[in-house]
Amino acid sequence: MASVAESSGVVEVIELISDGGNDLPRKIMSGRHGGICPRILMPCKTDDDCMLDCRCLSNGYCG
């Protein structure tokens, strides 16, 4: 199940993921480049510290 909202070139998708017993909502941000990056506040120093198609932003967090 997914819900989609679009504003200013960014598409947000809220999916239900399962951890084995509970379904948990997960927000993913899909930008203009087509990549998918979970919207989780995650500190980083390099792009390698980030998940999936995220990159390390100048504020020190993945996005």
Curated annotation (Swiss-Prot):
Coiled coil: none annotated. Residues 1-21 form the signal peptide. It comes from Luffa aegyptiaca (Sponge gourd). It is found in: Secreted. This is Trypsin inhibitor 5. GO terms for cellular component: extracellular region. InterPro entries: Prot_inh_squash (IPR000737), Proteinase_amylase_inhib_sf (IPR011052). The record marks 39-40 as: Reactive bond.
